[in-house]
Amino acid sequence: MEPGGDHRSRSSGGRGGPGPAVASARGRRLPPAGSSGSAEPEEDEGGQDLQLEGGALGSWGSAPLPSSRARGPASSGRKYSDHCEARASRPGKSRIPGRDHRRYYHDHWRLEYLMDFNPARHGMVCMVCGSSLATLKLSTIKRHIRQKHPYSLHWSPREKEVISNSWDAHLGLGACGEAEGLGVQGAEEEEEEEEEEEEEGAGVPACPPKGPGKAPAGGGCRRQRRGGPVAPRARRLRLSASRRAGGSRGLGARRLERRLKESLQNWFRAECLMDYDPRGNRLVCMACGRALPSLHLDDIRAHVLEVHPGSLGLSGPQRSALLQAWGGQPEALSELTQSPPGDDLAPQDLTGKSRDSASAAGAPSSQDLSPPDVKEEAGWVPERPGPAEEEEELEEGEGERAGVPGRSPRGRAHRRHPQERWRLEYLMELDGGRRGLVCGVCGGALASLKMSTIERHIRRRHPGSTRLGGPVQALIAREWSEKAAHLLALGPPRPESPQGPIPPGTAAASDEGGGDEEEEPEEEEEEWGDVPLSPGAPLERPAEEEEDEEDGQEPGGLALPPPPPPPPPPPPRSREQRRNYQPRWRGEYLMDYDGSRRGLVCMVCGGALATLKVSTIKRHILQVHPFSMDFTPEERQTILEAYEEAALRCYGHEGFGPPAPAPRDGGADLKSGAVCRA
């Protein structure tokens, strides 16, 4: 038999073929491995016979194996069968150093720490904030959570599952098992169904398989060329599963869409404290009840940082309590989170009323922040959001007429939108004439609508106003409102004041429909820059009046400002170290400010301090005269009176003045310490 076998294999090279039975058998076995039909040349039969096993192996190697490791698509072109599309780490293979960093990612990190794997960069992505982590380490995960969002550690497993489903919905992966079954179904399964129909129409019943390696040479050959020997069985299984799932595709798709919307809403509620309004496709803040212009994360971040930054530090139980309170009674929660009812006395009403009338007279513009149906039906809008929104719209209109196209609240446009909380929190009022801010404590005009400008102004002019309580701030706001109303009543006969650049601004404001009302806050700001406030002002007013006197401004009642009318002091004076001097140091530490040296002088020993810092004051007291810490209030008052009397005798006014006084006794250096030693 061996020679015969050798003769068959050698004779198949091209001289003569084998018998007809062998040729017919080989003709049946060639199509699965070959690339041609059933008709093959006789001289190539031997070569095809030698390539049969290799071709079959090649087709088996290219066919998708029903293995647990081959979870990704079979045609991805990767070298290894376990692709990075799977979520967990590789189940049973050793590590490949330098190639697959996925070996460090664990599936339980997804629900325990809300960390997903990004196969594109072989790293982790936080599903809470979207940040990319540097390494695949548990320590990196814990450090990221502690630094970015420690409150997520207190979330329940159900809340974490909501975040995970929302993340999958965001990536388009499907939020649950049904989502994966329905989301993956799509064009691929439709194509498979079409292929199945074509195969059924091509004669699948007419050509049933007769054996493990035998197949008819008709349509079945085309079918086997497509997927290999085991492809039809796997395709039938997949298509039967797709048919069962496709039977309820319409109902499942609707259910999936509803679940995704619910999970997205729950994610906004748990993470951002934002409730989603499906009717208007908007977000409503659960801390203040205001509607946001869009679903963009930049708008959410800007709103939280500008309106209530304290909500970022809420713990998990506090957030849960806020969610429960919002779900139970949103109106009561909005009343609790809103400003005190003293807003009616705030000077914002002076411009708000005029802008209310102006907006009522004109055509109603598109209010992106609060649609009327959401206001009336959901009850999510606070008591008085109208004036603030109309101010923003009017200011946007002013920017457009001035040549600035209307932009979204993100970017530089946020400088045109003052915040209502500035009235009582920082005692800052909007000046409609020049589109700036006016300080309700000292009457100074601020250059821009920025928090940094407000904080710098308060730190330089009256740092003690930050420690005022709510009743004192309400009293100052009430007095400011009364004085502003009085100035508005006296406003019409005063437009002839020497104000060069004001008429164009007021003319542009009059185009908006509120020109007269917006012209008067400008006069109010310029007059209040020189007029001291009523006795309800804080203790920092004497220092401010002293600065005004040093600058040479006359504190007249209604005197007109000089031709250069900026109320703040000149830049050299505003940038000196005096801005860091706290008036309370005078009574608390017995420290006075020396304007000639721009430093501190101790009233007890007369020593000069190097820097304007509390640490320097305390170190000086501990090193030189620690007994002064035990002084009673009466003793401190006695030292203050003696110091002021000596200063009056030496310099002609209380304390050290701005100019350095010339020595009177032939070069004797005058110090305030002589007062206490005397």
UniProtKB/Swiss-Prot annotation:
Comp. bias (Acidic residues): 187-201, 388-398, 513-529, 543-553
Record field: compositional bias (Low complexity): 62-78
Residues annotated as signal peptide: none
Record-listed cross-link Glycyl lysine isopeptide (Lys-Gly) (interchain with G-Cter in SUMO2), residues: K375
Taxonomic superkingdom: Eukaryota
GO cellular component, as recorded: nucleus
Matches recorded under SMART domains: ZnF_C2H2 (SM00355)
UniProt feature, compositional bias: Pro residues: 492-504, 560-572
Biological-process GO terms, alphabetical: negative regulation of DNA-templated transcription
Swiss-Prot/TrEMBL site (Breakpoint for translocation to form ZFTA-MLK2 fusion protein) positions: L138
Coiled coil location: none
Ranges of compositional bias, category Basic and acidic residues: 79-88, 573-583
Pfam families named among the record's database cross-references: zf-C2H2_12 (PF18658)
Alphabetical UniProt keywords: Chromosomal rearrangement, Isopeptide bond, Ubl conjugation
Record region (Disordered): 1-100, 182-250, 329-417, 490-583
Disorder noted: A chromosomal aberration involving MRTFB is found in 3 chondroid lipomas. Translocation t(11;16)(q13;p13) with MRTFB produces a ZFTA-MRTFB fusion protein. A chromosomal aberration involving RELA is found in more than two-thirds of supratentorial ependymomas. Translocation with RELA produces a ZFTA-RELA fusion protein. ZFTA-RELA translocations are potent oncogenes that probably transform neural stem cells by driving an aberrant NF-kappa-B transcription program.
Protein name: Zinc finger translocation-associated protein
Organism: Homo sapiens (Human)
